[in-house]
Curated annotation (Swiss-Prot):
The lineage of its organism: Bacteria, Bacillati, Bacillota, Bacilli, Lactobacillales. GO terms for molecular function: DNA binding. Homodimer. Keywords: DNA-binding, Plasmid, Plasmid copy control, Repressor, Transcription, Transcription regulation. This is Protein RepA. Belongs to the transcriptional regulatory CopG/NikR family. The keyword DNA-binding applies. InterPro entries: Arc_rbn_hlx_hlx (IPR013321), Ribbon_hlx_hlx (IPR010985). It comes from Lactiplantibacillus plantarum (Lactobacillus plantarum). Residues 20-40 bind DNA. SUPFAM superfamilies: Ribbon-helix-helix (SSF47598). Regulates the plasmid copy number. RepA binds to the repAB promoter thus controlling the synthesis of the plasmid replication initiator protein RepB. One of its GO terms (biological process) is plasmid maintenance.
């Protein structure tokens, strides 16, 4: 297993957005931080936050 250095952060997001994040994380069997990490990596690979 590869050891990944981690940094704790605090985000202030709307309650509704947090609910969506929790629902998506549960739906795909991920933690909220894992889902955020996945989405950030997807955007980095695509080079944009917009659909192409």
């Amino acid at each position: 297993m590869v050891e990944v250095e981690k940094k704790k952060i605090t985000l202030s997001i709307p309650v509704e957005t947090n609910g969506k994040l929790e629902e998506l994380a549960q739906k795909y069997g991920m933690t909220k931080s894992g889902l955020v990490n996945f989405l950030v990596n997807q955007v980095a690979e695509a080079g944009t936050i917009y659909r192409q």
